[in-house]
Amino acid sequence: MIKESMHKRAGQVFSLVWLVTVLVTSSHAHTEPRLGMDKLQGTSSIELMPSEAEVRAALAQQPKLAATKARLAGQGQEALLRRLGPYETHLALGQQHRRPRMSVESVSIDRSLGLERSLRLWDKLAVDQAWADAIESRANAERALSELSLRQQFLEHWRGFLRELLAEEAARRTAASSEALWIQAQARRRLGELAQVDEQTAKAEQLQAFADLIEARSRKLAKIEQLKKRYPVLGFDRSLPTTPAQWFGLLNAVQKLPTDIDRAEHQYIEQSPLVLLAKLQGLELGLQAKRIDLDQRPDPSLGAFVSQERSGAEHVIGVQVSIPIAGQQRAVAAKLAVHQLEESFSLNEELILEMRSDLRARLSSWQQGLLALKPRWEAYALHDEAAVRSLRGFALGERSLTEVLQARRVADLQYIQALSQSLELLLLKTGLELDLGLRWQ
């Protein structure tokens, strides 16, 4: 009886020690902070987006930039050609043999030299000079648009990198949760056959999560290698914020997006290289139409010539003016240019309308997304607390493994959704700042 009592007391002590161990382990199994609404505002020292100097250095090495410079140099020559115009001086040399029929005179030789040049009328000259100025302005607008396009392309590449970071963080989170659950199941395996089955299931979950984490990290490393080839000067040692305070610090850092949509719309349209380029192209078409209309009155040509006739016995000096007779094709070309100009105006209006609506939609998404972010993080905090309590209940035998897995998966899903929405808002804000001229200029 004494031996049986000692065995019973030892079993009770072991159960008590095991219970205390499980409770302590479960309280530390998940270290994510409990969140309240007072913790959702804050600052962050994490900077996910490269600095202006880093972006400038990265883009300076892009082949597309060199191609843009070459194209702009060609447009400078195009402007010079427009200033000069297709006006050339023509040299005419002639020689003829004169053989009289009814005369005793011998054969004589006539020689002539003439110069002729088309004259550009003064109103056409003014249009050509304005057209050349428009070409140079268009070249500057194309350069600005090309630089903006490079920055937007860079943002898309960086977006891919950050999404791989997000995938890795999601896999890390799942792996950590699976590890904590397996530890709890391992501590309960002595309770019987069902507890051992739970331990095996938890171990399988942990191995699967670990494999997913390895795959996520390999995809991230592959993306880094891809971007290093294109942007070798950039550093990729970055990690995502994991708390709402850090995310709100990033979203509220440095630049404040305009809250007045009408003001933001005006700023967007006024400084957009795309709109400026469309306006300058319309200006060019207008000048082209005006030039073609003026060409219905052809340019005259002025020439001078000297000649020697009868083997030098006679000298002739003369001046001549020639004016082409305009044909029907000039009037048709003028009407065609007017139609092209009207089409350009309509396309410009459509472009501006599309840009205005796109900006309003993105600004609205930013404002509404920012409002939705706080309750999303709060929802995650509640689900996370429920998952932790469910794990404690599992340690006490109050919850099944299936219930714990379900609670943890819901909490992890809420965490990933909050993290993903935070990242997408940061990318949305960065794109808006880029388009409004507030970033990477």
Listing of model-derived features with the role each one plays in the protein:
Residues 29-95, 119, 127, 193-196, ...:
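Bacterial Sec-pathway N-terminal export signals of envelope proteins
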Residues 33-50, 91-130, 244-257, 299-336:
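Small/polar, glycine/serine/threonine/aspartate-rich low-complexity segments that form flexible
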Residues 56-66, 73-88, 102, 113-131, ...:
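A glycine-/polar-enriched beta->alpha junction
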Residues 58, 115, 161, 227, ...:
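Hydrophobic/aromatic residues within transmembrane alpha-helices of membrane transport systems
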Residues 67-82, 139, 146, 150-175, ...:
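Amphipathic alpha-helical coiled-coil segments
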